[in-house]
Design a protein with these regions (language model features):
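Nucleotide and nucleotide-moiety/phosphate-recognizing core
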Residues: 1-145
Length: 145
């Protein structure tokens, strides 16, 4: 662990799949969200879930549930802002974010992001992968903020 708080971004509307919580979709014997939690937990000091709507539907997971501070489902950056506000309340100045619907991110994502930040006082590093057509594909839901 590296002194970061993890925020799982699960506040989307899932409009392309007709609505609902993508994180609760099954993957094997579990859910997408459970896989993300299992992957992120060893990489951070603690985790919160950024969700919209009735947060009590995630209470059984035992994590703090934080809602966007901006109304109207403003997108994942609103979740990042809510996560940063939550971290500030904990006395921490950075968060590592992961998307609730993308379970197969690196098991050393947080370490990679911190390494790329290189000791920045106010880090901002997002995940990226090589793309033969575009050069680089950025994945801003996975980042160090």
């Amino acid at each position: 662990m590296n002194g970061s708080l993890g925020v799982i971004l699960a506040g989307g509307l899932a409009t392309r799949m007709g609505g609902g919580d993508k994180g609760v979709l099954p993957l094997g014997t579990s859910t997408l969200l459970s896989h993300v939690i299992d992957r992120l937990t060893p990489q951070v000091d603690s985790i919160a879930l950024n969700v919209n709507g009735d947060g009590s539907r995630f209470a059984h997971l035992g994590f703090p549930v934080i809602a966007d501070s901006i109304d109207g489902f403003a997108g994942p950056l609103a979740g990042v802002l809510a996560g940063l506000d939550w971290a500030a309340e904990q006395g921490v100045n950075s968060i590592v974010t992961a998307a609730a619907d993308t379970p197969f991110f690196p098991s050393d994502l947080a370490a990679r992001l911190h390494r790329e930040a290189g000791g920045m006082a106010h880090p901002l590093v997002i995940a990226a992968t090589p793309d033969p057509k575009r050069g680089t594909s950025r994945h801003p839901t996975f980042g160090l903020w």
